[in-house]
Amino acid sequence: MVGVGFAQRPGAVAEVKGEIFGNIIDSIGGEAIPYATVMALNPLDDKMVAGAVTKENGSFSLANLPLGTYKLKISTIGYTTKFVENVVLSETSLTYNLKDFRIYQKTLDIVEIDGKAPEITYEIDKKVVNVEDQINTDGMSAVEILRNVPSVSVGADGSITLRGSAGFTLLIDGIPTIMDASDALASIPASNIKNIEIITNPSAKFDAEGTSGVINIITKKSKLEGISCLVNLSAGRFNNYSGDVALNFKKNNFIFDISGQMSNRSRPSETTTERTTTYDSLVNRLVSVGDNDWSRSSRGFGGGIQWNPNNSHVFQLNTDIKWNQMLPYSDFRFSEYVDDSLVSEFSNFQNNNIDMFNNTSSLYYQYNIKRNINHNVSFKAIYNNSDVVQNDTTLSYNQDGGIRAGNLYTETGPSGSWRFNVDYKLPLKKDRKFEAGLQAQFGSSGDIGKNYTYNSVTETFDFNPLFSSDVEYVRDIHAGYTMFSGKYKSLGYQLGLRAEYTFQTISTTAATEYLTIDQLDWFPSAHFSYSLKNKSQLLVSYSRRIERPRSYFFEPFITWDDPYNVRTGNPNLLAEYINAFEVSFMKPFKSKGFASVEVYARQSNNIINRISSVYEPGILITQPYNIGVAQSIGLEGSLSYDIKKYWKINAGANAFYFILNGNLNGVDYGRESFNYSARLTNTFTFKGYMLQFVSAYESGSVTAQGESLGSFSQDISLKKSFMKNKLAVTLMGRNILGTERSGSTSFTENVFIETLSKPFAPQIMLSVALKFNNYQKVADRNEQMDDF
């Protein structure tokens, strides 16, 4: 509020009037403060003479004021009330400009909010999942968080799919990462995540990349003045541990952030594989049993600065540096049978060492035209750099310990990209908005692959030039988009069109010819929302998307997984094109929760599948191919409900019918399956404790050459908070019943393979989280609760 007061009674010069105007902004970020109350008070008795409420851009005007001296009072929920004394309107100064007046968020007399934010909020083009109120996240990574997110499935091996597809785009605070999505998510501490945006049908403003959409990780940011700190430590079974710290300093119009983290993630499994090969009447059976793991360690730090000199300008500079090491290994014992008679036994050991350095830096500038935060132009520059050193060693041993065969593969190479964006927003009348933008992206990478074969005579590895090659990749993507959105009564709409130009070349020293891609594609999008009674919503959307193959899909190298399996890339892969439709309905139950139902359909053309074929007698080679068209038609539902004050449930289910129409080299790969998954979370609160049970089941699915198995898991968490929720201790158990598994069956010509992998269980983790200042929700004791 703003108020004005007089040293003398106004009205001495009745025919002359004055005006007090200006704009109110946040003291930290410089954002406009809408709906703040501005009062002009008489300083003699503090009675109100005039009042106004700030607009969306924070501006206000108190016009037709009698000349005199006023006292201004500015107040709004969540901010400290401010007064401005001796504001004078006179014949020589008829106006008073309160330009960029800063008010401060409250830091004193704060109490913790008892209520929790909704688990999921629905916007016209996305679902926003609240993460910071989940109790089973301490000490975990973003991968574990996604296990409890609707539409997302995480396999026992850590693989991530969005509505059954592994093709999605990962953003971190809106910035794409050059790392593989699973690797990037494994390096993000769950305690640093505020929200996760699930965008299954992205608008034209987003990159068109991603079969099933976009997952955007929104990290926590402090909101009050001074220094804030968040510290997390955790340790558990199977050599799992982590630690991270985040510091935030805010003063006036500057914000500084710095963070550091280290972690080691390991989830060993026991795997059994049975491979049956039929030669006329002869049956050869190869059985392998052993342990395997894909452990990851991560070290990194990041920092950022934001400067808001006034309500017109915003500057941000951020950088994030990580060192990741992946150490996948397998140790299997093989038994070979011919017509059920044991003919040989040996062991196979594979040890990989992948060292990766990654740096992501970004610069952002936004100019608010006429100090209107809804009318702006922004510029963003992003630099991504990654350097990888990989060593894969495969050794096969006889029973006496002697090496019977071996292979060594090394790969080195940097990759990098530059990305530049310019975006413009223009508010129009009647709740309408126009947006447009341009993007330029330049990407390149190089791989030097060398293959070595074990020499039993010299007991060294000999270089094999036949399976070695240098590869250079160049992929540039330039884009432009335009969007128009608005609202008419209860109907909201958003229409967009995006154009993307792709230029891609691949060169190699191997005798391989690659396609050059030089083409322009169009990607329309349409989103509609309709507000019904009782705050229910109906959402309808459509988008066209593209899934470009990753660079390693083109690799000409031959990589040995074991003595009987090799893999390589395909130089002639084409991009997948996807059409996606959705209809969603969301109904809230007042303060009890909500329910939602979504119907969706997706068609992917040029679908990419990995196909196995005979490489040499007894050896299979796996390559990616475009084999045809895939269709999915599904139904997804979510329910969140407070059964009792101390008991809350969160349930979700997804079911879809999958049809694959594929053909390659005259072989029919057509398959169909009905897939489904379900998740149930029960949360109990009692005497300062929170107890949570998470049960999940995912059915199997078909592939071009087989099918995967279903899996059930059960997690449990117990959390206790101390020191007014500044200190929290969480004990969590994952897969406590030991029922989680991953497995598959596949068939290739005369070869049938069954694989079953079960992770070691249970996985136990103890975590401690310590918060200073305001890494929590706060509200004033004397005002309405407000999650700001």
Regions found by a protein language model. Name each.
Residues 289, 417-421, 462-469, 570, ...:
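Outer membrane beta-barrel strand-and-loop segments of large Gram-negative receptors
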Residues 208-215, 223-274, 296-299:
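Outer-membrane beta-barrel translocator/receptor signature
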Residues 63, 142, 148, 175-200:
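Short acidic/polar hinge/loop motifs at secondary-structure boundaries
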Residues 9-12, 25, 29, 37-41, ...:
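Short, acidic, small-residue-rich periplasmic hinge/interaction motif at the N-terminus
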Residues 213, 217-231, 298-303, 324, 387, 503-505, 534-580, 601-622, ...:
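Surface-exposed extracellular loop regions of Gram-negative outer-membrane beta-barrel proteins
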Residues 43-59:
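Short, acidic Ser/Thr/Gly-rich low-complexity loop/linker segments typical of extracellular
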Residues 100, 142-145, 160, 183-184, ...:
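N-terminal periplasmic accessory domains that precede
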